[in-house]
């Protein structure tokens, strides 16, 4: 591997030799064990003897030890030596984990996986594993492909971010000194490199300067932050004394976008105080280094650094760290981060001022409480650096201004106070400088112009700290680590086991003892450490000791994590308390905690610094701080400054700020997918290679490493979904994989077979509801089994292929053998005959015989005539078929007209139904008014309720007496009060969020109170009564609270008293709830009264607008009808004009059906076919040009021969022979051209038929568009009906409200009525939303139809061009015929007797051909007319589409109006809910009169019974009214039947998709193989193309050589020409013949050159053809993308149809109010859906073609996988929330049941305790009443939370169902993908065939080229012979008359010799 050459590879993975060496160690699983050792942790040993539970072991050191068996731990086999993932260990125990880490650390393999996280051990030295080459090794690799490394985890986070579209976080945790900071820097560098943005174009920069990129700036933040935030501690030389969360933002393509930093818990105290062995922050020592010697002078640092107290209290240098080099890096980082020189200098000046300020000294004035400066040198230097006056600075420190009353005075400070003020200012100043640095870095890293879609957060925060002296800072650092550890535990352990519970597998919940909630609550909960610290900060005269004593009193002995500190040992400081953290027990000292928490600052000093003139940075950092004087001035001016001191409130402690930032951090982490890096300290000595076993084991335990591995081993870490499992492992059990449609059952069958075969055991796996779970390593075992099975199958497959190839090779060899035998026989015969004289004579005579050649030519002409006759017969047949199809179209048109007529009748029926609905609505209004009258009769019953209140009040008085008797017993439970109070406070904290919501509702209530003021005047009398009831209720609530408190304390001691109390409290609670509910509902209805009246007017006005819109739509319908009549007339005209095109149409229909069946295989071949047609047309054009050139050449030759005929008969005979041969060649070329023309004509016919089919589809789309438009109109009318119905219902509601002013007893019935109205409103809103979606669907379809119309227009234009091209070809063919006719006539002059008959026959056939051509031309003309008509139809269709678009836009505007109405109703509903809540709170205060009714209990019972009877009677009346209104509901069943039919038709539409999805499950296993085959095929094609290119290159070279030879021959010809000219001068009589001969030779040479160029052009065209084949693949992929988009549109259309179906079901409920209308609408919907169904069936071919688009579907599959993962994560999170809500609701139920039981039990005891209760005093009664009120409020809060919990539970359930549905959809998409892959394989095969055909075509062209080359050589030889004959003729020109026969014989001999040579060469 290339990786192994990297120098860092040896520190990442062992070599094979090392692995073999480690695995060859001796091992016995029964004897080799680990035993505990106090020094090494564990030692290896071997068992020698066993006796009972004792074993004797010989250690590796040779010692013999006897131990108990339980202390011995198993040893893993050598196979797992130095394993990279410790979860793979067979024996998982502490000893094995420690040994694995120790052995890897000894080999400097510092990274090791531990289950799901990574463990890294600090190597304490530099390793070459973080170089750029190492980083590149891990980029884009899976985590399992590479060795453990920080980069592997980082790359996994990066890929998860891009694939899952989820933010990621990397939590690098561990103790201080473990290497967190270094790993953080490496992670940041890696992400900067991966998402590098340097290649992006940016602004022009100076070419002499290096461009600073964003990744450089991100990396350079580390030196700056480390200089100001890192310091040396006892355990770490570069310890981060602050926490940071670095968010690196990326766009959706993974490109680096920006970065920002958030920091936490900066240790400010370090700047003024350092512990022994530690150092202040690095920046101070860097400034004092010699990197910039002049800097110290500028900063006035003239003393040794050891003399500056603030930075020199301990260490000054660090071993191994060069401050000069570090300062250089810091200064350069400032420049890269765009810090200006002034900003840098100001920052350094502030650091220098800090050092100077630490050296300022003060002394106490004698006998005064006033401090004064003891020397001003350092103060002057500090003031100089600050840019302020020295005297002003010192005065502000020693005499700060404070406010006394209303005046500001100077307050004297003693030395201690001044020193405190100096330290506080130093800490505050440094903290603000650090904040400024972080903000400046964030500003620089905030890049503009790149989207920030996702981020990866890297958390580096101070590790857990246990020092000798632990103070306020250590408490917060340890608290943060505690929270992070709990986050890790919850993510790693709880969620894992909850996954098992959700899947329903057999699993016992394991408690791994890592719940850190107790420690966290001890710190942050009420009465916790932080809460008590904040409380002490506001208590006067509070000190650190009072805080410590309160903490001890509150928690010692009561909380398991709070302990008394042990006495200090060694250097340990004194401690006030100890706390047990997850990492150990820490001793804390409370010294200065109050001051650190309050963090006070000297406002006078701050004011002076804000006036600085020499340091702009100082002014900037204090700009947001408001001093007391400034706040007072703003208060006087009305500025509202108050007393804020630069904080977020009037008093914000440091703890509050820390807690807020920590909560934000945890919230952010919970929204990301975490990746954990656990850093381990190997030893305390910072020595490389040494492991401190006890220290490492403690960290492993605290970090949860061992528990993580254990749960990973005990659980099932590997899992896969049922469909995925079945698809991948179906090869192991093919029969079982297809046994059932349920994938879970298939998975169970597969696993059962594997268990029966012995491949697996039942303990290795579990089958859940949706997934199969595996133990660690089982999945790898299954993969091995699968690979073996695949190897077996592939071996058999390969053997079959080899057998088949062998047979083919044998057949080829046999055919080759037969051909060779024939060739050999012919060669032998020729060798025998060539010396035979008769054969020689035959060879000379045969070429002179013309009869045979003429017969062959006549036969060829006869064949052509027959072919033309056949083509005419086919044309006649096509014409007849087109006529038949035209008749069918006429019938279809008539049926469409009948449908339009039915639509008109339906419109009139709809108007009648509207009138009926209005009448029904009036009747309903009357019935509701009667109900209102009945409700008004119940007003008198309110008085009965008041009497019931008095009776309950008497019972409360009895309870008071019993309470006095219980006082003595309650005192005994006083010791339990504190714990109960703690619980109450915790509940109060939980209720704070509810209180905030209540506060918001109160604000809304105030707004509503202004509106309801008039109504409240009418209710003033009721409010007076309510006030009186409030007073009584307050007393009773206090009583109940006291009862609750007393019963809580008495619960353990006296159970009998608890039971009595529960009974009483339950009864009181029930009565109170009844009163509260009645009051709330009464007030709610009163408030709604006014609103409903105003809303009624607005709804009525909207109804009028909608009616106007209905009339407008009716007018549009009439216009559409007139347009339909016009279209009918046009269609009638079109029917007459299409009679001649019927034949082509039937052919096209048949081809369309065939194409519909084959579209899955051909995919996007249409575009490729168009390209092939274009290529063939180009080839045909070239052939035509060649033919024309050949004709011209031959005509020239014939002209020359005619001139020579009179002068030299022999020369003419020779030329005629040559012309005959050339003519034969041209005849062949012409025949080929004619065949190509016929093919093109056939293609033209096909394209014409396709065009006609497309026109038919366009007409169908127009019909569909009109149908959809009518459907949209009908839906608009429905929406109007719904709106009018809604208005009427609202008016009815207003009438009801006016009748219910004082009807409190009937609130429940009115509430139900209100809920019905709300549900109707929701139904109307949902219906409107569905209408909007349908309109959007219509608009999308219209756009699609318009796009298809444009495509049809383009195809029509192409067809017209093709027709014109064919016409040109026919004209050229006609011209060729005329030329041949003239030529034959000329040749007939030579032999008139022999050729006269043939000429007559040819003339007759030519006339017949001419007639056929005329007929074809007339047919083309008719087709052209048809095309023109179709073009007009297409334009009309486009106009209709535009009109439909306009209608759709109008519908969209209408929908927006409806949406606004719905939004108004939604707002009003929210207002009503707010009013209801406000009324509930008001009416709680009006129910206190309940307990005055002492003597009315029996009357109350009677009244309640009467109310119940009345309620029953009213319910019965409402039921009767509902039955009356529902008389129209009988048609619902008819609607359901219609809807079922519609659903069946939609199922037919989805049939093709379902088949593809079913086939996908069985074919998914072919995906990987298909991809491999595709890559192989591509590589083979590329190789073959490369070979062809080489062949073509060789051919070009050969052509070049041939060209050179031709040029040489041309030169020789030129020489010959010169010689002939000289001869011409000598032979003046023969000059004309010589010129003609020379011209002929020149033309022959030119022809040869032309032929050569033409052949070269053909070779180039062949090469272009091969390149075009390559481009075809790219075009096909683009077609895949386009088709996939269309598939997405169709899918959305499918989903919208499903939504429409659901809308139809919801419309059934609405049909109760409009039964008659629903029946007609259902009929209309049936007609519309049937038309849509027919349209969808016609589009099935297009849908099937879309299935072949693979590449985009692969992207969809990946996206589906990502959504599936995200959905699973969401489901997991929702399940967690669901569990929490369930637990909370169960807890509330238990509390409620307990309270009810207590009230029931205490009722029995109250009577007995009545007499004793009188002995108590008024104070106890008041206390108990107060307690009753508190408990009642808590009870109300618990009820609200219980209701909220139920709501959240329902929402979570819905979310889980939605996610499950999404997962199912993703599965279906994946199944559909497999079908597409198979189709792509078929397409690849066709492309292979096309490539082979191209190769064959190239070979044929090469052969043709060779033949033409031979012919050219023959022509040159004949030219030579012609020149010889001419020379002979010139020599004998003056001879006697007998010379002519001599010339003739010599010419004949030449003619005989030339063909002989030609034939010999051809033979």
Curated annotation (Swiss-Prot):
Chain intervals for the UniProt region annotation (Actin-binding): 662-684, 766-780
Annotated family: Belongs to the TRAFAC class myosin-kinesin ATPase superfamily. Myosin family.
SMART domains tied to this protein: MYSc (SM00242)
GO MF terms, alphabetically ordered: actin filament binding; ATP binding; microfilament motor activity; structural constituent of muscle
Record note on disruption phenotype: Viable, but paralyzed. Double knockout with madd-3 results in lethality. Triple knockout with madd-3, and either cebp-1, dlk-1, mak-2, pmk-3 or sek-3 results in paralysis (as in the unc-54 single knockout), and suppresses the lethality phenotype in the double madd-3 and unc-54 mutant.
Keywords assigned by UniProt, alphabetized: Actin-binding, ATP-binding, Coiled coil, Cytoplasm, Methylation, Motor protein, Muscle protein, Myosin, Nucleotide-binding, Thick filament, Ubl conjugation
Post-translational modification N6,N6,N6-trimethyllysine, affected residues: 125
Function field: Required for muscle contraction.
Residue stretches of biased makeup (Basic and acidic residues): 970-988, 1133-1146, 1322-1336
Domain remarks in the Swiss-Prot or TrEMBL record: The rodlike tail sequence is highly repetitive, showing cycles of a 28-residue repeat pattern composed of 4 heptapeptides, characteristic for alpha-helical coiled coils. Limited proteolysis of myosin heavy chain produces 1 light meromyosin (LMM) and 1 heavy meromyosin (HMM). HMM can be further cleaved into 2 globular subfragments (S1) and 1 rod-shaped subfragment (S2).
Positions of region (Light meromyosin (LMM)): 1162-1963
Protein's recorded name: Myosin-4
């Amino acid at each position: 591997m290339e990786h192994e050459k990297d120098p860092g590879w040896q520190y990442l993975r062992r070599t094979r030799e090392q692995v073999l060496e480690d695995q060859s160690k001796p091992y016995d699983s029964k004897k080799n064990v680990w035993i505990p050792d106090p020094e090494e942790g564990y030692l290896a040993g071997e068992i020698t003897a066993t006796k009972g539970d004792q074993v004797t072991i010989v250690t590796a050191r040779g010692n013999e030890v006897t131990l108990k068996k339980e202390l011995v731990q198993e040893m893993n086999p050598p196979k797992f030596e130095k394993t990279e993932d410790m979860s793979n260990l067979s024996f998982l125990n502490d000893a094995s984990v420690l040994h694995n880490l120790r052995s890897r650390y000894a080999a400097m393999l510092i990274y090791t996986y531990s289950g799901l996280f990574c463990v890294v051990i600090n190597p304490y030295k530099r390793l070459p594993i973080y170089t750029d080459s190492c980083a590149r090794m891990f980029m884009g690799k899976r985590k399992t492909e590479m060795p453990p490394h920080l980069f592997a985890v980082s790359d996994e986070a990066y890929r998860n971010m891009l694939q899952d579209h989820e933010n990621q976080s990397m939590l690098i945790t561990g103790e201080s000194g473990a290497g967190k900071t270094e790993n953080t820097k490496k992670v940041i560098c890696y992400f900067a490199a991966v998402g590098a943005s340097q290649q992006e174009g940016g602004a022009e920069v100076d070419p002499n300067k290096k461009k600073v990129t964003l990744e450089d700036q991100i990396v350079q933040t580390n030196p700056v932050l480390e200089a100001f935030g890192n310091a040396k501690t006892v355990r770490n030389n570069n310890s981060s004394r602050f926490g940071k969360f670095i968010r690196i933002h990326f766009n959706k393509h993974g490109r680096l976008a920006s970065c920002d930093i958030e920091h936490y818990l900066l240790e400010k105290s370090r700047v003024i105080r350092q512990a022994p062995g530690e150092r202040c922050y690095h920046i101070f020592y860097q400034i004092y280094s010699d990197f910039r010697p002049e800097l110290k002078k500028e900063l006035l640092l003239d003393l040794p650094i050891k003399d500056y107290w603030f930075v020199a209290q301990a260490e000054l240098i660090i071993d191994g760290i060069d401050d000069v080099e570090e300062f250089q890096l810091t200064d350069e980082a400032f420049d890269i981060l765009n810090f200006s020189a002034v900003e840098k200098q100001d920052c350094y000046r502030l650091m220098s001022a800090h050092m100077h300020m630490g050296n300022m000294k003060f002394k106490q004035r004698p006998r005064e409480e006033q401090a004064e400066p003891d020397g001003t040198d350092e103060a002057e230097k500090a003031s100089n650096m600050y840019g302020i006056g020295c005297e002003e600075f010192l005065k502000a420190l020693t005499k700060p201004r404070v406010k006394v009353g209303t005046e500001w005075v100077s307050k004297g400070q003693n030395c201690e106070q001044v020193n405190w003020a100096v330290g506080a200012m130093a800490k505050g100043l440094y903290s603000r400088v650090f904040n400024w640095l972080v903000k400046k870095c964030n500003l620089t890293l905030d890049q503009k112009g790149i989207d920030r879609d996702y981020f990866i957060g890297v958390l580096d925060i101070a590790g857990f700290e246990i020092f000798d002296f632990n103070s306020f800072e250590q408490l917060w650092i340890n608290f943060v680590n505690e929270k992070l550890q709990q986050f890790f535990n919850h993510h790693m352990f709880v969620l894992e086991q909850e996954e098992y519970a959700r899947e329903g597998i057999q699993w016992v919940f394991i408690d791994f003892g890592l719940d850190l909630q107790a420690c966290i609550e001890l710190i942050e909960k009420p009465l916790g450490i932080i809460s008590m610290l904040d409380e002490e900060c506001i208590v006067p005269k509070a000190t650190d000791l009072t805080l410590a004593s309160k903490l001890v009193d509150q928690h010692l002995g009561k909380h398991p994590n709070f302990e008394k500190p042990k006495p200090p040992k060694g250097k340990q400081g004194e401690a006030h308390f100890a706390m047990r953290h997850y990492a150990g027990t820490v001793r804390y000292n409370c010294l200065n905690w109050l001051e650190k928490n309050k963090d006070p600052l000297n406002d006078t000093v701050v004011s002076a610094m804000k006036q600085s003139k020499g340091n702009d940075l100082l002014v900037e950092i204090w700009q947001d701080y408001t001093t007391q004087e400034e706040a007072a001035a703003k208060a006087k001016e009305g500025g509202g400054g108050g007393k804020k001191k630069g904080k977020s409130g009037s008093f914000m402690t440091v703890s509050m700020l820390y807690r807020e930032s920590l909560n934000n951090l945890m919230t952010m982490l919970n929204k990301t997918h975490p990746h954990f890096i656990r850093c381990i300290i190997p030893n305390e000595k910072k020595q490389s290679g040494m492991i401190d076993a006890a220290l490492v084991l403690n960290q492993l335990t605290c970090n949860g490493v061992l528990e993580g591995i254990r749960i990973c081993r005990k659980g099932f870490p590997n899992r896969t979904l049922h469909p995925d499992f079945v698809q991948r492992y179906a090869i192991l059990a093919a029969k079982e994989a297809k046994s059932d449609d349920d994938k879970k059952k298939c998975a169970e069958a597969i696993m059962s077979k594997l268990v029966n075969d012995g491949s697996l055991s039942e303990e290795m796996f579990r089958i859940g509801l949706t997934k199969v779970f595996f133990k660690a390593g089982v999945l790898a075992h299954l993969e091995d089994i699968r690979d073996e099975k695949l190897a077996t199958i592939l071996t058999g497959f390969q053997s079959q292929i080899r057998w088949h190839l062998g047979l083919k090779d044998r057949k080829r060899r046999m055919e080759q053998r037969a051909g060779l035998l024939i060739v050999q026989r012919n060669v032998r015969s020729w060798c025998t005959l060539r010396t035979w004289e008769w054969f020689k004579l035959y060879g000379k005579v045969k070429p002179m015989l013309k009869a045979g050649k003429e017969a062959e030519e006549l036969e060829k002409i006869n064949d052509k005539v027959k072919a033309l006759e056949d083509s005419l017969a086919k044309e006649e047949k096509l014409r007849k078929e087109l006529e038949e199809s035209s008749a069918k179209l006429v019938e279809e048109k008539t049926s469409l007209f009948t449908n339009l007529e039915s639509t008109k009748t339906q419109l009139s029926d709809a108007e009648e139904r509207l009138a009926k609905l209005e009448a029904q609505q009036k009747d309903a209004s009357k019935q509701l008014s009667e109900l209102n009258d009945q409700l008004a009769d119940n007003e008198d019953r309110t008085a009965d309720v008041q009497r019931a209140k008095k009776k309950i009040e008497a019972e409360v008085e009895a309870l008071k007496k019993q309470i006095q008797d219980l006082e003595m017993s309650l005192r005994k439970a006083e010791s339990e009060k504190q714990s109960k109070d703690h619980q109450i406070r915790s509940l109060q904290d939980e209720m704070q969020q509810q209180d905030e919501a209540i506060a918001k509702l109160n604000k809304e209530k105030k707004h509503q109170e202004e509106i309801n003021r008039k109504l409240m005047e009418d209710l003033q009398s009721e409010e007076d009564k309510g006030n009186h009831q409030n007073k009584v209720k307050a007393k009773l609530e206090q009583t109940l609270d006291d009862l609750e408190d007393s019963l809580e304390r008495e619960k353990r001691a006296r159970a009998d008293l608890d039971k009595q109390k529960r009974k009483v409290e339950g009864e009181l609670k029930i009565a109170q709830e009844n009163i509260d509910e009645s009051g709330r509902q009464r007030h709610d209805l009163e408030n709604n009264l006014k609103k409903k009246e105003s809303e009624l007017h607005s709804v009525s006005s909207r109804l009028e607008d909608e009616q106007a819109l209905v009339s407008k739509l009716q007018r549009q319908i009439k216009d559409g009808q007139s347009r339909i009549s016009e279209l009918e007339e046009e269609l009638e005209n079109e029917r007459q004009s299409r009679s001649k095109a019927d034949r082509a149409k039937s052919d096209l229909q048949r081809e369309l059906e065939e194409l519909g069946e084959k579209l899955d295989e051909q995919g996007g071949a249409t575009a490729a076919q168009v390209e092939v047609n274009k290529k063939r047309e180009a080839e045909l054009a070239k052939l035509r040009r060649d033919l024309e050139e050949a004709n011209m050449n031959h005509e020239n030759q014939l002209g020359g021969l005619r001139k020579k005929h009179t002068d030299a008969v022999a020369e003419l005979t020779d030329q005629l022979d040559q012309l005959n041969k050339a003519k034969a060649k041209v005849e062949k070329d012409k025949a080929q051209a004619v065949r190509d023309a016929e093919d093109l004509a056939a293609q033209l016919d096909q394209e014409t038929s396709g065009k006609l089919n497309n026109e038919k589809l366009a007409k169908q789309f127009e019909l569909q568009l009109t149908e959809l438009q009518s459907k949209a109109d009908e839906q608009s009318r429905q929406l109007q009906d719904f709106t009018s119905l809604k208005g009427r219902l609202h008016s009815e509601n207003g009438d009801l409200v006016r009748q219910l002013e004082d009807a409190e007893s009937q609130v429940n019935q009115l509430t139900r009525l209100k809920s019905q109205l709300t549900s109707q409103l929701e139904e109307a809103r949902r219906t409107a939303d569905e209408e909007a979606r349908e309109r959007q669907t219509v608009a999308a379809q219209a756009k699609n139809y318009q796009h298809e119309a444009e495509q049809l227009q383009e195809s029509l234009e192409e067809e017209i061009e093709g027709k014109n091209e064919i016409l040109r070809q026919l004209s050229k063919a006609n011209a060729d015929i005329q030329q041949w006719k003239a030529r034959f006539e000329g040749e007939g002059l030579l032999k008139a007797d022999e050729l006269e008959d043939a000429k007559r026959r040819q003339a007759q056939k030519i006339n017949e051909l001419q007639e056929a051509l005329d007929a074809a031309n007339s047919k083309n003309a008719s087709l052209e007319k048809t095309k023109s008509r179709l073009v007009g139809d297409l334009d009309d269709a486009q106009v209709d589409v535009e009109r439909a678009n306009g209608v759709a836009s109008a519908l969209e505007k209408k929908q927006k109006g409806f949406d606004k109405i719905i939004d108004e109703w939604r707002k009003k509903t929210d207002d009503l809910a707010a009013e209801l809540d406000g009324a509930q709170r008001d009416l709680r205060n009006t129910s206190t009169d309940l307990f005055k009714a002492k003597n009315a209990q029996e009357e109350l019972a009677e009244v309640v019974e009467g109310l119940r009877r009345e309620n029953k009677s009213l319910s019965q009346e409402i039921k009767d009214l509902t039955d009356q209104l529902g008389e129209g509901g009988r048609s619902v069943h008819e609607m359901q039947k219609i809807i079922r039919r519609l659903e069946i038709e939609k199922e037919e539409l989805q049939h093709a998709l379902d088949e593809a999805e079913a086939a996908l499950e069985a074919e998914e296993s072919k995906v990987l193989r298909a991809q491999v085959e595709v890559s192989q095929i591509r590589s083979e094609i590329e190789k073959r193309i490369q070979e062809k290119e080489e062949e073509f290159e060789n051919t070009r070279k050969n052509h070049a050589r041939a060209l050179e030879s031709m040029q040489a021959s041309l030169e020789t010809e030129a020489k010959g020409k010169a010689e002939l000219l000289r001869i011409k001068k000598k032979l003046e009589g023969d000059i004309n013949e010589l010129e003609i001969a020379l011209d002929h030779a020149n033309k022959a040479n030119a022809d040869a050159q032309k032929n050569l160029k033409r052949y070269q052009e053909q070779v180039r065209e062949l090469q272009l053809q091969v390149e075009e084949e390559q481009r075809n693949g790219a075009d096909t992929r683009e077609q895949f993308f386009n088709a996939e988009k269309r598939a997405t549109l169709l899918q959305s259309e499918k989903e919208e149809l499903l939504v429409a179906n659901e809308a139809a079901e919801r419309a059934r409920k609405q049909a109760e109010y409009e039964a008659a209308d629903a029946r007609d609408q259902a009929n209309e919907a049936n007609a519309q859906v049937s038309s849509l169904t027919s349209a969808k069936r016609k589009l099935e071919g297009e849908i099937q073609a879309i299935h072949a688009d693979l590449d985009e579907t692969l992207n969809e599959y990946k996206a589906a996988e990502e959504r599936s993962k995200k959905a699973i994560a969401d489901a997991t999170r929702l399940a967690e929330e669901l569990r929490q809500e369930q637990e909370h609701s169960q807890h509330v139920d238990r509390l409620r049941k307990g309270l009810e039981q207590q009230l029931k039990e205490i009722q029995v005891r109250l009577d007995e305790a009545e007499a004793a209760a009188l002995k108590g005093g008024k104070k106890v009664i008041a206390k108990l009443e107060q307690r009753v009120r508190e408990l009642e409020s808590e009870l109300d809060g618990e009820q609200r939370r219980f209701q909220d919990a139920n709501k959240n539970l329902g929402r979570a359930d819905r979310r889980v169902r939605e996610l499950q549905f999404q997962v199912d959809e993703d599965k279906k998409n994946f199944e559909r993908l497999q079908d597409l892959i198979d189709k792509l394989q078929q397409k690849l095969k066709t492309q292979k065939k096309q490539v082979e055909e191209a190769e064959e075509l190239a070979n044929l062209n090469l052969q043709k080229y060779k033949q033409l080359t031979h012919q050219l050589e023959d022509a040159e030889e004949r030219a030579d012979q012609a020149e010889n004959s001419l020379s002979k003729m010139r020599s004998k020109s003056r001879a006697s008359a007998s010379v002519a026969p001599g010339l003739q014989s010599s010419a004949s001999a030449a003619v005989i010799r030339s063909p002989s040579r030609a034939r010999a060469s051809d033979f």
